[in-house]
Every structure is written in structure tokens, then in C-alpha cells.
Design a protein with these regions (language model features):
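Extracellular, repeat-based ectodomains that mediate carbohydrate processing or recognition
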Residues: 21-383
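Surface-exposed loops/turns
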Residues: 419, 444-445, 458-459
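Glycine-centered coil/turn sites that cap beta-strands in beta-rich domains
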Residues: 385-403, 407-428, 437, 449-455, ...
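Positively charged n-region of N-terminal signal peptides that target proteins for export
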Residues: 1-5, 481
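C-terminal tail/sorting-segment detector
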Residues: 451, 455, 459-481
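Beta-strand-rich interaction surfaces with strong enrichment in secreted/lumenal proteins
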Residues: 438-442
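Sec-dependent N-terminal signal peptides
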Residues: 4-15
Length: 481
């Protein structure tokens, strides 16, 4: 589906106005007298499967630092109570999470054994029960800042480790969903520091990126694997400038690898982006995404076909706040920066996730005196299933009858727009209650098809309504299960 990146650059969803309207209020997820902290941006702090969200963090409420977890079963509307995942006399911190179906995997750094090691645990029932802690590393040095990703039964964890004197990047893989683990693999080898690795997997294609100062200043490097992390390419230098490139975050779908990082080449720290179309072998040019007087740090990236979402922390307004921007054409163009937080405290290390049409962000925030975990969502910030079927400008507005009708549970809705402008396509029940929003933002002129999946609704009569400028049309559809 990422062919949209090539075929439809004219699909310029200028979503900034729509996303401003749709981002909901901040939600405080933790409430205790200690500090609640997320991992750095090399790791994912929030993950999802469908409408079920899962997040992890470090918390000192029990005297020493432990790993905590909580979930939402309704796309972030409500959240369950905090669950303590670790319980030992050492400190546990920098947790990273991956979710696939009902399987939740968490990895973190832990010094219960005297030195810092990488640990792992998982749940196979959606977070209700958890396995015992599994120690993955065993050496006399420091192993920390883990990142995790999985595809099917293949799981890969990357981390930094100074068992060899200086920090190097290591990886470890499991071929059976985290039940058994293979030997550690050292991925970097130089006399300088290789740190803060971030990992992404799509099928058997694995990419790991990190920051490295072998060249005198910090640059971004990567390695890729085409066999699920069994063997690896050589090291590839991805940035090349006289300043510092740090804080890399990476994601992938098929052969498409998207990467963002912080870069000081322009005097202050800015957010940059680049992508690969061939699984991380070659990358396009660097793109500067921010241009502000304050420093921009710790970007987090999530993608869905041609839609690329990036959030980061930035101090252009005096204190650190969370900012966001979107590309709807595979990184060819970008929206303006959108400030998501606005309080007197510092908002830092945000982590972004996509679930269906919704966007979710968690971050650390000290507006309450101590640092707590906050959450924010945009229910329609990732417009899934919207496909441009023609860029020829139609003669007038048109809303077609859905097909098939009756349907179960998927149907298609076509609509035509003679002019660019704000468009809303929503579904309502018999009582007039809005039950789904398929489009809510700016669209270019053309003809589009929206895929609607009504798996969460019961059988009955529903209505879908298109609103565009002065045009409004409503049609009836029937769901039969």
C-alpha cells in the first residue's frame, strides 16, 4: 500500500486544521509523590493492538525504581489501574514495549544483580498476567537503553553495552516469540562510543540505527538484516556534517524505512528526517523539519502507509513542550508544527503510536511539581482507508451509495470534490449519535474511496454524511451480522 507514496503526491491532506480540532485534552495517567519517567526516544513507550493501548514507564513510588504498566481497552478513553511489573531491591528503568495481538513484550535495564543488565518479560493474555523476569545479558559491565520490536515470532532487542571497554551496539533475537533467546551479537566495532540504538522489524527485514562518535562528532549509523536478525550488513553512516546528530527514532513497513533524529548542524538543535525505499540499504537526502529558536529534541515516529507522524519536545516557547507534525504523502511534504502541550512545566520524551484512525502520545510532564506520565489522543488523526481513485476534477460534489449494501462488516464509500477544502465524512446511528469519523480535514479536489469497517457495531440501520463547504449529503446503509 505504500505505493501511494509514488502514485498520489497530489493527495495533499493539509490536516493541520483538522488535527488542531481533533486533539483532545491532556490526560494524567499517573498520580504519586515520586517521579514517573518514560524511556528515551530510541524505545517505544506506548504500543497498541486495535483499540487496546499499552504503556510502560519507570516509577519510584516504592522507594526504588520499578517498571509499571497500564492499559486502555477503549482507545484511550479510560485507563486501568497501574500494574507493577518488577519487584526487586535494585533499580529498573528505561522500559520499552512491543504489542502484537494479545502478546505484550517489555524489556528494560535492571541492576538487581549489582551491575546493569537487560531483562525481559511478556504477557500472552493482553496484560492480565505476566511471565517471570528473564535476564538476557550477563557480563560484568553496563547494558542499558534497550529497544524492542517483533514481527510474527521473530523478536529483536538492541541495546548499548560497554563490556568491551567503550559502548557498542548489541542485539539479541528470539525465533519463538521470546521464549528462548540466541546469543548476543555485537553490531558496532570502533574505538568510540556507539549508543542509544533503535530497532524496527517488518517481516524478516530488521533495521537498527544508533548515534556514533567514531568520526569525531556524533553521527547516525545503521545496520540491516534480511533474515530476521540472524546475519547483518556492514555499518552504514547515514549523516555527514560537522556538528552533532543524535536521538534517532526509526520505523518500517516492508521495504520502507523512515527515520528521524535531532541535529545541531544549523546552530541549535532541529528535527531531521530521511527515508529508505529498499529496506535500509540506501537513504534519501536529509530533510530539516523544524526551524525554531529553541532546541528540538527526542523525536518519535510512527507511520501508516503514506502517513508519517512525528512528535518531539521543543523549548521555543521557553520551557519544553510537545510538538507534532504530519506528512500525508510519504515524506514529500509536511504540515506546519503543532504545539500539543501548553503548561508551566516541562513536557519531555514523547512517544507516538497509531491504532487504526487514532493517534496516541504519552510523555513525561512536571506541571504537577513532580514528574508524571501524561497522555493525549486524536481519534481521527490517521485517516485510514482513504484512497484517491481519480485526481481529475469532477463537475460537482457527489456522495455515492456505499457498496456493498447491506454489508458485514466492511463497505466502501465513494465521494467527489470539485474544490479543495475542509471535508468531514462521518457515520451516525439511528439516534443521530456519531459512531465513526472517516475523514475530518482538508482534501484536494478529486474522487476518493473510504473503506469503513464496522466490526464494533451491532446490526442495524446507519447513516453516513458528507459535509464539504456548502454541500451536505446523507445516505443510509444497513449492517447485517
Amino acid at each position: 500500500m505504500k505505493q501511494i507514496k509514488f502514485l498520489f503526491f497530489t493527495l495533499l491532506f493539509c490536516f493541520q486544521a483538522g488535527t488542531i480540532a481533533q486533539w483532545e485534552n491532556d490526560t494524567r495517567l499517573t498520580n504519586n509523590s515520586s517521579q514517573s519517567l518514560l524511556a528515551y526516544n530510541n524505545a517505544k513507550s506506548i504500543s497498541s493492538d486495535g483499540n487496546t493501548l499499552h504503556t510502560v514507564w519507570t516509577d519510584g513510588r516504592d522507594g526504588n525504581l520499578e517498571i509499571y504498566y497500564k492499559r486502555s481497552a477503549n482507545a484511550g478513553v479510560n485507563w486501568n489501574a497501574d500494574v507493577r511489573l518488577t519487584n526487586n531491591t535494585g533499580s529498573s528503568y528505561y522500559p520499552a514495549i512491543h504489542v502484537g495481538g494479545n502478546t505484550i513484550m517489555v524489556t528494560w535495564t535492571d541492576n538487581r544483580d549489582g551491575n546493569y543488565e537487560i531483562y525481559f518479560k511478556k504477557s500472552e493474555d493482553g496484560g492480565s498476567t505476566w511471565s517471570t523476569d528473564t535476564r538476557l545479558t550477563n557480563n560484568a559491565s553496563l547494558s542499558d537503553y534497550p529497544s524492542i520490536d517483533a514481527s510474527g515470532s521473530t523478536v529483536v532487542i538492541s541495546w548499548q553495552d560497554n563490556r568491551d571497554g567503550n559502548y557498542e551496539v548489541y542485539s539479541k533475537r528470539s525465533g519463538d516469540g521470546g521464549n528462548n533467546w540466541e546469543a548476543d551479537q555485537r553490531l558496532s566495532s570502533n574505538s568510540a562510543f556507539s549508543e542509544y540504538p533503535t530497532v524496527t522489524i517488518s517481516g524478516l527485514k530488521v533495521n537498527i540505527a544508533w548515534e556514533d562518535n567514531r568520526d569525531g562528532n556524533r553521527e547516525i549509523y545503521n545496520k540491516y538484516s534480511t533474515d530476521g536478525g540472524v546475519t547483518w550488513s556492514g555499518e552504514n553512516r547515514l549523516t555527514n556534517n560537522s556538528s552533532q546528530s543524535t536521538s534517532v527514532s526509526i520505523t518500517s513497513e516492508g521495504d520502507f524505512v523512515d527515520m528521524t533524529w535531532s541535529d545541531q548542524r544549523d546552530g541549535n538543535w532541529e528535527i531531521y528526517y530521511k527515508y529508505s525505499f529498499d529496506g535500509g540499504i540506501n537513504f534519501g537526502p536529509d530533510q530539516r523539519l523544524t526551524n525554531a529558536s529553541g532546541n528540538s529534541w527526542y523525536p518519535s515516529i510512527a507511520t501508516d502507509d503514506a502517513f508519517i507522524h512525528i512528535c518531539w519536545q521543543e523549548a521555543r516557547d521557553g520551557n519544553n513542550e510537545v510538538y507534532y507534525k504530519i506528512s500525508t504523502d510519504g515524506g514529500a511534504s509536511w504540515s506546519g508544527d503543532l504545539r500539543l502541550t501548553n503548561d508551566a512545566g516541562a513536557s519531555s520524551t514523547p512517544s507516538i503510536n497509531i491504532s487504526g484512525s487514532a493517534l496516541h502520545i504519552v510523555w513525561s510532564d512536571n506541571r504537577d511539581g513532580n514528574t508524571e506520565i501524561y497522555y493525549k489522543r486524536n481519534p481521527s488523526g490517521n485517516p485510514i482507508g482513504i484512497v484517491p481513485i481519480s485526481t481529475t476534477i469532477p463537475d460537482g460534489y457527489k456522495l455515492s451509495q456505499n457498496y456493498p449494501n447491506p454489508f458485514n462488516p466492511v463497505t466502501n464509500i465513494e465521494f467527489a470534490l470539485p474544490n479543495a477544502g475542509y471535508v468531514k465524512l462521518a457515520v451516525y446511528d439511528m439516534n443521530g449519535k456519531e459512531v465513526a469519523v472517516l475523514v475530518n480535514g482538508q482534501l484536494a479536489a478529486g474522487t476518493y474511496k473510504a473503506d469503513y469497517i464496522a466490526s464494533s457495531l451491532s446490526s442495524g440501520v446507519y447513516f453516513y454524511k458528507l459535509t464539504a463547504k456548502d454541500f451536505t449529503a446523507t445516505k443510509k446503509m444497513i449492517l447485517i451480522k
